[in-house]
Amino acid sequence: MARVKRGVTAHAKHKKVLDQAAGFRGRRKNTIRTAKAAVDRSKQYAYRDRKNRKRSFRALWIQRINAAVREQGLTYGRFIDGLAKAGIEIDRKVLSDIAIHEPDAFGALVASAKKALEYLKNTETPNAFEGAVR
């Protein structure tokens, strides 16, 4: 059986790691041991931050919606509740976009949410336990 020398595969693996570490500062870009550690850590950060990006974008959309809704005399929570009661299912990304680029359409959404909240407020049945003697 022939002897297998690992030089070619080892060189390919090292080259792959060093290519991924291109742009790093100092010894981390050209020493295989530190480059491998830095690349591994950067992949962990990338994985974590892909999850965090979703959170931060949702928070941004909510802040934008809240600002636009407060200009029209409603809070974010009441607005979302009103949309749900009105049967309007639009996600926060689209709501944020509408609030920025089409204020008239957003005003119509706010009006329909207010109308749904007001309608349900007037038609609620009284609580059966109110006024009961204990």
Swiss-Prot record:
Pfam families: Ribosomal_L20. CDD domains: Ribosomal_L20. The keyword Ribosomal protein applies. Keywords: Ribonucleoprotein, Ribosomal protein, RNA-binding, rRNA-binding. It comes from the Bacteria. GO terms for molecular function: rRNA binding; structural constituent of ribosome. GO terms for cellular component: ribonucleoprotein complex; ribosome. The keyword Ribonucleoprotein applies. GO terms for biological process: ribosomal large subunit assembly; translation. Belongs to the bacterial ribosomal protein bL20 family. Binds directly to 23S ribosomal RNA and is necessary for the in vitro assembly process of the 50S ribosomal subunit. It is not involved in the protein synthesizing functions of that subunit. PANTHER family: 39S RIBOSOMAL PROTEIN L20 (PTHR10986). This is Large ribosomal subunit protein bL20. It comes from Brucella anthropi (strain ATCC 49188 / DSM 6882 / CCUG 24695 / JCM 21032 / LMG 3331 / NBRC 15819 / NCTC 12168 / Alc 37). The lineage of its organism: Bacteria, Pseudomonadati, Pseudomonadota, Alphaproteobacteria, Hyphomicrobiales. The gene is rplT.
